[in-house]
Curated annotation (Swiss-Prot):
Name this protein carries in UniProt: 15,16-dihydrobiliverdin:ferredoxin oxidoreductase
Family matches, as InterPro entries: DiHydbiliverdin_OxRdtase, Ferredoxin-dep_bilin_Rdtase
Functional description taken from the UniProt entry: Catalyzes the two-electron reduction of biliverdin IX-alpha at the C15 methine bridge.
Pfam families reported in the protein's UniProt record: Fe_bilin_red
Cysteine-cysteine disulfides: none
One GO BP: phytochromobilin biosynthetic process
Family: Belongs to the HY2 family.
Gene Ontology molecular functions: 15,16-dihydrobiliverdin:ferredoxin oxidoreductase activity; cobalt ion binding
Reactions catalysed according to its record: 15,16-dihydrobiliverdin + oxidized 2[4Fe-4S]-[ferredoxin] = biliverdin IXalpha + reduced 2[4Fe-4S]-[ferredoxin] + 2 H(+)
Enzymatic class: oxidoreductase
EC number, as in UniProt: 1.3.7.2
Key words of the record: Oxidoreductase
Length: 236
């Protein structure tokens, strides 16, 4: 499950003249002790995106997880693309969170870079779950148009691929339109990406999930050395 999303991203990254970055074998593919859970990771870089990572967790019929985060280079003030998609097989429930995660919360910045998410939400009513917004800090690294779905098998089969494709294509089109930085310079962009990693290191809900499957030692290393690598940077 979700292999089609991985392939879709790889195709788009390839079209950006991106290349795969070699990562530690313990992150590339890792099994828990009884091999019921397998995690696979990919890391890419391109002229436009300094880091684009993909994670797939295979828990068989019980759980499937897909995550991707794209960091623009430090010359671009664009938001960070973030997507978390989870399928709970036992309860037949889909949870998806898709957002252009803003570096700042200034209204004009949000309107310029994030508001087009609203158009996508209008097309897919099941992915407009405002009831769950309170679990995310809207004053930090989430946009007012964050796409949230708490759906079912129908949403998984019928809607997910289409909305994910629209979500990624729209984001790439924003970059292709070559917007001029209006709000942040390169140093401020770097600082805000560092702050994003520090915030995510503290708040990411996947921490507990990974610890329960793969143990605390591996999870701590994985979060620091793969997921949020700027977490240890010092802001001057």
């Amino acid at each position: 499950m979700f292999d089609s999303l991985v392939d879709f991203l790889k195709t788009n990254i390839d079209q950006l003249n991106g290349h795969e970055v070699q990562i530690s074998s313990e992150f590339k593919e890792h099994h828990n002790e009884d091999s019921k859970y397998i995690i696979k990771n990919w890391l890419f870089s391109s002229p436009e995106y300094r880091k684009w990572r993909i994670t797939r967790l295979d828990g068989g019929k019980k759980l499937q997880v897909f995550n991707t985060v794209a960091y623009p280079n430090f010359e671009s003030e664009l938001p960070i693309l973030g997507a978390d998609i989870l399928w709970f097989g036992t309860s037949q429930k889909l949870l998806a969170i898709l957002d252009y995660q803003p570096l700042i919360q200034e209204s004009k910045y949000l309107e310029k870079y994030c508001s087009s998410l609203g158009i996508i939400k209008e097309e897919y009513s099941a992915f407009d779950n405002n009831k769950m917004k309170n679990i995310y800090d809207s004053k930090k690294y989430f946009s007012p148009w964050v796409i949230i779905c708490r759906g079912n098998k129908l949403n998984l089969d019928r809607d997910l691929n289409d909305i994910f494709h629209s979500f990624v294509n729209n984001y790439l089109n924003i970059y292709k339109s070559n917007p001029v930085n209006q709000f942040l310079n390169s140093e401020e962009i770097k600082i805000n990406q560092i702050k994003y990693d520090k915030y995510s290191f503290e708040k990411d809900p996947a921490d507990k999930l990974f610890k329960s499957f793969f143990g605390e030692k591996w999870t701590k290393k994985f979060i620091n050395k793969f997921l949020f690598t700027l977490n240890n940077e010092i802001i001057h």
